[in-house]
Structure formats: C-alpha cells, structure tokens
Amino acid sequence: MGKRFTEYSQFDLSQVNKDVLKKWDENQVFAKSMTERDGCPSFVFFEGPPSANGMPGIHHVMARTIKDIFCRYKTMKGYQVKRKAGWDTHGLPVELSVEKALGITKEDIGKKISVADYNAACRKDVMKYTKEWEDLTHQMGYWVDMKHPYITYDNRYIETLWWLLKQLHKKGLLYKGYTIQPYSPAAGTGLSSHELNQPGCYRDVKDTTAVAQFKMKNPKPEMAEWGTPYFLAWTTTPWTLPSNTALCVGPKIDYVAVQTYNAYTGEPITVVLAKALLNTHFNSKAADLKLEDYKAGDKLVPFKVVAEYKGADLIGMEYEQLIPWVKPVEVSEDGTWKVSGKGFRVIPGDYVTTEDGTGIVHIAPTFGADDANVARAAGIPSLFMINKKGETRPMVDLTGKFYMLDELDENFVKECVDVDKYKEYQGAWVKNAYNPVFMVDGKYDEKAAQAAESLDVALCMMMKANNQAFKIEKHIHNYPHCWRTDKPVLYYPLDSWFIRSTACKERMMELNKTINWKPESTGTGRFGKWLENLNDWNLSRSRYWGTPLPIWRTEDGTSEICIESVEELYNEIEKSVAAGFMKSNPYKDKGFVPGEYTEGNYDKIDLHRPYVDDIILVSEDGQPMKRESDLIDVWFDSGAMPYAQIHYPFENKNILDNREVYPADFIAEGVDQTRGWFFTLHAIATMVFDSVSYKAVISNGLVLDKNGNKMSKRLNNAVDPFTTIEKYGSDPLRWYMITNSSPWDNLKFDIDGIEEVRRKFFGTLYNTYSFFALYANVDGFEYKEADVPMAERPEIDRWILSVLNTLIKEVDTCYNEYEPTKAGRLISDFVNDNLSNWYVRLNRKRFWGGEFTQDKLSAYQTLYTCLETVAKLMAPISPFYADRLYTDLTTATGRDNVVSIHLAEFPKYQEEMIDKELEARMQMAQDVTSMVLALRRKVNIKVRQPLQCIMIPVADEEQKAHIEAVKALIMNEVNVKDIKFVDGAAGVLVKKVKCDFKKLGPKFGKQMKAVAAAVAEMSQEAIAELEKNGKYALNLDGAEAVIEAADVEIFSEDIPGWLVANEGKLTVALEVTVTEELRREGIARELVNRIQNIRKSSGFEITDKIKITISKNTQTDDAVNEYNTYICNQVLGTSLDLADEVKDGTELNFDDFSLFVNVIKD
C-alpha cells in the first residue's frame, strides 16, 4: 500500500510559499473565490490606493495582511468579496520625484520644460514601481485584483470626481476665498488642514525667538515717567516682524507697567506685559533692588511695577512701526492703492492667553489666520507689496524669500519702501530650509542649513543693536512641516477654492458614531476630535499633475460654471465654438463620442493640464470663461474612490444606489490615514450622499524597529520585505506581525520574532502533522470509516474535541469583531498547549503498533479533525501553510472536494460537543502538571525519574473531584506514584502573605505600617479565606482595613523533603526524595529514551525489531535486570543482554558514569 499522506524530509516555509503560489496561479484560485460566490451576499471592501512611484516597505505587509485576513475570512464564511486594487497617481509625491529626476524646480515648468512634457513624465514616473508592488502583493498572499485596478489619472476616474464637485457646487459647498492657508514653499502649493495633521508633520524645532519692544506713541502718564515706554510682544518667527501692523491684547487679562532696564543696551525703559507672565521675564530676586543702583552688565536687572490695567484699557493705544521698511497700503477694488494710516495700534483678541509669551500678540495679518481675522475686525491693514503686475502680495514671495526690489512696482517702491533699509534684506530666505544652496544632489542638507545663520538671527541682532529686543533666546516649539518635502510650512494669503465642510460637521460627527472603529478610541479620539475642530477643506493646489478643478469663470468673476461630465464640457465647447472663442472642438476633432463609456473612447482625450487650460467657454451673457488654474487636493482623488472606481454615476449607477457595492463593510489602513483617507472618504460620503462610506475600519499602528525607532534608509534600520519573505516565507511574517501586538498598536519589529514564530508555532504544527502522517500511513488510515460516536470515544478525545469547538466559537467571534491578534493567539495556544504538548504527547502509544481498534480509529479521526480545523481557522492569517496542510490532509482522504482551503467553508462549532466541566477538569490536570514540572526543573530532576508523591491541599469538594477525575493522568504525566489530598487548613503546608507596597501604599497611606504588620501575622485560616473570597478584613486596633488578593503575594514555605508551588487557589507539594527503588526505575526509563534515540539516528523503521547489548556497570545492572522486559517492550526489543565489553557500541553519558549500548536489527 502506498503512502497517502505526504511526508516531508524537511520543513521549508519559503518553498511552501512558492509551491502554493504556483497552485493558486495555475488553478486561478483567487478568481474562483469570487466567481464561486456568485449569488451570495456581498462583503464590500475598499482598497486604499498606494502610490507606485515609491518602493513598498515592510509596513505595507502589515497593512495588507490585515486587509487580506478579513477578506479571506468573509469568503470562507460564504460571502462574495470583490477587492479591486487601485493606484494613487497624482499629487506632490509624483511631482517632486519628477522634479528631482529632471533637475528642475516648479518655477522651471513652462519655461525649461512644457507642462505637457512635464505631465507626461509624471504619468510615466507614477507607475515606476508597479512591478515591485505587484510582486510583493503576490508573494505575501494578498488577494486583490491588480489586473483591473482603478487609476486616479484615468479620464473616467476624473470624470466622477468632476461629478462629485458639481454636486458640492450645487449645494453651495464650493466657494472661492482669499484667506491665510498653510503653504509649502518647497512644494509651491497650499495644503489642507488634514494634510498638515498627518503624523509627524508637527515637530519640535529649536528656533531663535524674540521678545520685541514696540515703542509707544501716546503712552499713559505713568508709562512715560521712566525711560522710553514699550509694549512687549513675543514671537517664535522674528522674520514676520517686518510685516507687523498691530498688537493684540486680551480685554479681560490683567497687564502691568514695569520700570526697568534693557539688559542688552542698559537703557532705562518702561514695559507693558501681562501680570501673570511677570515672573517669566523678571527675576524675583531683583524686585527689591533700586533702579538707580543698576549698572550696565549687572546680572540682576532691577524692576518696579508702577501700574496695572485691564487689556481693555490698552486698546487703541498706538506705537511706532518696529521695522519700518515698508509702509502698509490700502487697496481698493479697482486695484488702486494708497498709504494707510490705520495700522500700528493695540486691538482686542479673545484668543490671547497668558500661557506663554508676554500676553501681547504681535500681529502680522499676511502670515497668520488668527492675525488676519482680528486685524480685519479692527480695520487694521495688512502689509502688502505691489508687484510689477499691480498685484498685492505679502512681503515674502511664494518661494519663501523677501521680494527683490526690481520685482516691485516702481511707484510703490518710491512711496512706500525705505530702500536703504530694505535692500540689505531683499531676497533673504525666511527659513534656510527654502534656500536652494542647501539642496545638494537633489537632497536637503539639513545639518548645513541649521548650522548657517538664519534670517531670524540676523533680525534679532539688528533689533538688539537698536534697543528693540527685550529678550532673545532659543526656544523649542511645535511647528508644522510639509508632509511630502519635510520642510517647514508658512501661513500665507492665497486665492483658494474651498469645500465648506464645516456646514456638514454635525452630520459627519453623527454618522461617525455609527462606524465600528478598531480601536474605538481612534474613532472617538483622534478622528472624533478632528471632526469637532473641523475647518473648511482647502481644495486648491497650485501644481500641474493632478485633477483639474472643473470650474470656468469670467474675468470679472460674475459668471461661472462647474462642469460635471465630459459630455457637458463637450456641449459647452460647442457653444464656445459658435461664439467664436474656440476655432474647433478638440474632443470632436479627436473622435470622442459623448455617452460612450469605453476605455478606447476616453483614451482619445486627456482631462489634465495643459489641455483643459486651452479650453475657453462662453457665459450666458456672451463673455469668455477660462478655467480656474488650480488642481484639486489629491486626497479628494482617493476619498472619491468608492464612486470613481466604478465610474459612477455614468456607469454602474444601480449597484451603488442599491447599496450592493457601497458603503464598505470594512476598510483598513495605517493610523496616518485617520485624518487623510479615512477623513476624505467620510467627508465626501456625508456631503454628497448623506451616508457613511465605511461601516468598520481598522487603523493599524506604525511598524518601528526593535528599539522603537522609525524605520528609514538613513538610519539603516529598514527591513526589506522581499528578502524577509524569501528567507522565511510569508506566513511566519504575517503571523508574527498579527499576533505580536494588536494591529492598532505600534509594532517593534524584530526579525528574531519571525524565527521564533516559525519554530514554535509552525514547527509544532508541522511536527504534529508529521507524527499523524507517519502512523496514518503505516496503519492505512484514510478516514473512510464512519465517525466513532462521541459517547464511545475516550475522555481525552472528547476533551480535545470540546476544546476544539470552543476554539472555533472564540476564533469566529474574534474574526467577526476584527480582533485578529486574539484569534491568532487562541489558535497558537491551542496548537502548542493543548494539541501538541498535551493531546499528542498523552496519546502517542495509541498510534503505535497493535491492532486497528476502535480506540486507534478514534485517535486518528480526532487528530485529523483537529488538524483540518486548525488549518481552516488559521487560513486567513497564514494562507500558505494552511492551504498546504489542508491539501495534504484532504488529498489523502477526499473529504473536501475543493482545490484550496480558501474555497472551503469556515468551521462551525457544535455546541453539543462542548463539555465545559470536562475542559475544567483537564485544565486542572494541565495546571497541576505544569506546576510539578516547574518544581522538578527547580532541583534538576528529570521527568523520567519517578518520584513518590504529590500533596495537594484542596479548597472544596468540587476542586477535589476535578483532580480525582484526572488523577491517573497527572501521575503519569509528572511520573509520580501517588497523589494525596489534604485539608487546606490541616497545617501540612504553611502559607505566607507578602504585601505589594506599590498597590497597598496609596490605599492606606499612614496606616501602611500597621497593615503590613497585620498581614505578616495572618493565620492559615485567614489566608484561606483571602484565597477563597478574594479579599479579607484586617483588624487594626478595632478599625477594619480590607485587603484584596491582588494587593498581596501568597506563597507557600517549603517543608523538609518537599518543594511547594502556589498559583492562585492551587497549591501543590512535590516529594523530591529519590529512593533506591525509584532510582532503578528512573534509570530504566532513561535507557528507553536513549535506545529510542539510537533507533532513530540509525534510520530504523518504526516497526523494526531490535537486539540490545549494554555494557555492565554497577550503577545500572540492577535496573537493567529488574526492568528487562519493560525496556524491551518499549523499544521493540527481542532481547536485552549485559556484557563485560560492548564493541561498536554507542557511548551513553550519565551524570557521574557512562556505558556503551549496541543496537542491531533483528
């Protein structure tokens, strides 16, 4: 009879990976997993689109494993799970990569390279690493349809985006505004608030800060009695001081006037600042010093508070312009301008605090949203420049430097600019990070930039010399950085299009409460708080490669149209041609057919720049309309994927409207997407469809190195996923990542952990299968017989099947509740603790030799069922080895007629097979065994050495009954002759209690000493009560003090000849005295083990009979003679002889002697 169950000579999960992939590919298993579920309920999954212009990393394995787990699980549960891959192809990552490759900057586009050629380069670059992404996806076993992905640059995808924008436009949720926005000079575009709130965007930076002195024009009398009067205002961005036009105070805040000296110049001054911050800027030790005694250079600068005010008392006071390079101007609607006289005064602001600074805020309306708002409310002008085009611009240009004089309007320069003062600073970069001199070979030299003198330092030195700086110091503060360039952002006035997301904020919050967030805290915390503080969505991007904003406007802005489809644009172009604004319709010229939604038809056109920029439309009153030049936020692209991936509403309208493919039942991405993709999905769904976009979401944590550091090429701590999979296979990697910590926790990735998983879990499971296959093939077991009825199976079989069904129930619940870590750990514990280390170990003899009895059949059927079920339970997490194991089992038995485990049904638990009382009894056996084996290890007594007795104090009859039922099993496992039960209070074992001061200290405080003394004096009866009830009331001189079992450590004292262990309510004592009789039996057992090892290393078949010869030795001869028959029976020996000399024998070394054994086949 041939072998039916495959047996392996080695365990190679990397090869398993390759073999199973080949099988999947040849049998189109992924496609079948969907087609065979036609007509079944749908489980809707959305794939967040990665960008293929960057290599995939180990963190992508984590995110994709999580997605794959639940898609596979739901498929096995009978759902049809379609999963379409996608590519995020627009935006800054692509553009910056292309700029670097071409050696250009944004300013070169349209000059050194045409927009068409530049965008063609972007289109090519964005798919650069597609093959690597496809390879990793394939190798790691992530099933997603990469043959038909959605691609965000596709014209049909863009058309859906236009349709969505039109819906927002119709609802009045799309508007244009000139407001202060986060702006990235390095990227050359504005940023949305959700981009600015990506993890890592806000960083602690060490900058030069200044408390500037603003000289008063009309001081109150008491302010002018000592030196020159100043307002003090603190800033972390001294480069904005030349743009200052106001100071802001809190009307209800208390302020003080302080007579003192400038520490740098020694000049007498009177300064005004918040009373609460007085001690921040003045040394209290100097409060009693006389002003007249001060000498320039003294470390202690005297000060004297001479008056107090409310902020409201200061409003309206005027001061001199701090850095009078440029005069502020007022600009009328027709573009004419005049010098303004309304600036440089104190204004109110409710947002002013006394947490830091001086309680007076320096206002530069062109560089701060709050600044702009309070200035506008108070009629304060912004400090603008007028360029040669007549446009009003901040003092800093879009590249991050002060405007050059020759870029400005000549009349403006003549009337408003102090050329002598300003020319020294024209062209100065406000932050060294923007200066191209610090870009070396396309990389930012951050160290060099930080080492060089900054504009902040230069301005502070200038102010210091002019008696305008009260204090200059380095300060660490949190500052936003661009999510793609890693360089600081500015807050800058921009003409931008916005989505009025704040209008739907309440509804977004309401719908968010219906989403199942894993973890829940992300939904209520990070995401929920984000929604509570929502800002309008800055949609505009001043770039080239992206989805064009589909809005055309007249020059005066009186008419506009938002285009929702290519067909509408086609028809509007026809009107424009008729009006004479366009010579012909480019879409008609290229043969585009409106309403025909084929790929070939849409490939005839291109909806990107520069082609849409060339289209001029006509307004209803006959004026030309040009497209607003902006692109839209790339995050809108990805947030629209539920609709755009199916070209909604132009195609597939019914299946989305009927909610067949929407909303998603489940999505998953990294925690960095909480305010990215998760938000944009939710925002668009709420604003357009009044719906959630997803019902459940897992936001997985970061994958860090083993020391908790972020992985990066620079730190040389990044892990290559390809080499890792090649070495270990995907399964150990996936299992390690999922079971090491919950997906939403950060993972400290340690490559050694993969090897541990491979050995401990997969190795154990492989060995268990190998054991089964070996003996099943010997006995010809093929599972053709009817199942042995449960009632007729031995208790140990009924126990493991009960535990197995409990496992099915618990694992199914875990998967269903998106708790993969719990599921994996449950499976691992079952395989290691229950199946391998307990069931198989206890039942080996049932599989060895002998007749094919019902008992042996029950053992085979039970172990087979366990292996097949474990394979199915683990399949979502470790799809490769699960499939291999399942195939090896079912090919031999023919029990499941499916080509892959991933087409099989997920196991269903059978309640009638679960016996909790039996599980409790066996758990007791396992617990006692574990404790006794630990005691053996403590004194280095091997399990093969029999011992006389275990003594167990029992708390009650139920505990005693549980142990009695498994008494023989325990005795056999720990190799003792007897188990004795004693009354827990019989005094045989003495228990003690030790306080945990960290827990009890906070509870009892000053009473702790008395509590500790009372605990030390607790009687055995009191300790028993504490163990039984979990708490005990101590008597402290008539007062009651209740301690809990968790607050103390209960332990047992060893007694002579015995070792004692205690865990919870269970205590065991092991007699460790080895008598001569026990020693002989131990030697016999040890010889059995050594001879079995010789059989194995000699390559004998398990059925081969042997002859044994052992060299004589006074230490072992008695044992060999006494246990001759026992030894032979155990090792299939036909004879066992003692000899004075054994030639060609194997040397066996014992603790203090050695002997030789010869084993030959009979």
From Swiss-Prot:
Q: Which GO terms describe its biological process?
A: isoleucyl-tRNA aminoacylation
What cofactors does the UniProt entry give for this protein? Zn(2+)
Say if the entry is tagged with keyword Nucleotide-binding. yes
Provide this UniProt record's keywords sorted from A to Z.
Aminoacyl-tRNA synthetase, ATP-binding, Cytoplasm, Ligase, Metal-binding, Nucleotide-binding, Protein biosynthesis, Zinc
Residues binding ATP: K713
Q: Where in the cell is it found?
A: Cytoplasm
Motif 'HIGH' region, residue numbers: 50-60
Q: Identify the residue span(s) of motif 'KMSKS' region.
A: 710-714
- What EC number(s) has UniProt assigned to this enzyme? 6.1.1.5
Q: Which reaction does it catalyse?
A: tRNA(Ile) + L-isoleucine + ATP = L-isoleucyl-tRNA(Ile) + AMP + diphosphate
- Highest taxon of the source? Bacteria
**A Gene Ontology molecular-function term?**
zinc ion binding
Q: Name one Pfam family in it.
A: DUF5915
Where does it sit, as one GO cellular component term?
cytoplasm
Q: Which InterPro entries match?
A: aa-tRNA-synth_Ia, Anticodon_Ile_ABEc, Ile-tRNA-ligase, Ile-tRNA-ligase_type2, M/V/L/I-tRNA-synth_anticd-bd, Rossmann-like_a/b/a_fold, tRNAsynth_Ia_anticodon-bd, Val/Leu/Ile-tRNA-synth_edit
Which family does the record assign? Belongs to the class-I aminoacyl-tRNA synthetase family. IleS type 2 subfamily.
Q: What task does this protein carry out?
A: Catalyzes the attachment of isoleucine to tRNA(Ile). As IleRS can inadvertently accommodate and process structurally similar amino acids such as valine, to avoid such errors it has two additional distinct tRNA(Ile)-dependent editing activities. One activity is designated as 'pretransfer' editing and involves the hydrolysis of activated Val-AMP. The other activity is designated 'posttransfer' editing and involves deacylation of mischarged Val-tRNA(Ile).
Domain remarks in the Swiss-Prot or TrEMBL record:
IleRS has two distinct active sites: one for aminoacylation and one for editing. The misactivated valine is translocated from the active site to the editing site, which sterically excludes the correctly activated isoleucine. The single editing site contains two valyl binding pockets, one specific for each substrate (Val-AMP or Val-tRNA(Ile)).
Q: State the oligomer form and interacting partners.
A: Monomer.
The molecule here is called: Isoleucine--tRNA ligase
Q: Which gene encodes it?
A: ileS
